[in-house]
Amino acid sequence: NQYVLRLDNSKQMIDQHSEKSTKQLWDLNDGLPKWPKTPSLLASSFVLHWLDNPQGQLQEWFNSLSSEGCIALAIPIKGSFPEWYQAAEQANLTCTALELPTHDSLIRVVPNQNILYNKIEIIKQTAAKATSLLKPMIKVGAHSSHEEQLSISDWRHLLSFWPIHNKDKQVSLSWSIQFLLIKR
């Protein structure tokens, strides 16, 4: 009697799943929905960092699991986007990237013996222009930030400082992704 429920606060993201999928529109900042049965698996890819208080949310998710339940998590963490931060600093502008949780702040909320897997991977994307790397982030709302947005002229100024890292004159955008498998 197990099934997969796809949960998101974005109707656009929910609508990307098959019509046959079980889906629920839900704002995870309000906590998890009240389900008739406690979940045996919570899987989250690039969601937790959008939420207010990701650490508190992770602790709630852990506490909501059934006995022997698991959380599988992929989340960008602090240390992501060094190129963006470098360009902003050199352009004397505020980096408007979303502030991400630290590796330690996430694992601190779960007992160490319950962490089955904990690894950080650096993923580097390259393109001819930084805008090609940033536009897909904007498409999924990843440009959201607590910082005041830059004007178009400020963006142009920032992009002129984006570091070029290879002989092909390509630019990069690097992500630090934490992968966690947690068992209750």
Locations of regions flagged by a protein language model:
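A short glycine-rich, Lys/Arg-flanked "PGG" loop and its adjoining helix->strand segment in the class I
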Residues: 55-70
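Conserved Class I S-adenosyl-L-methionine
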Residues: 116-184
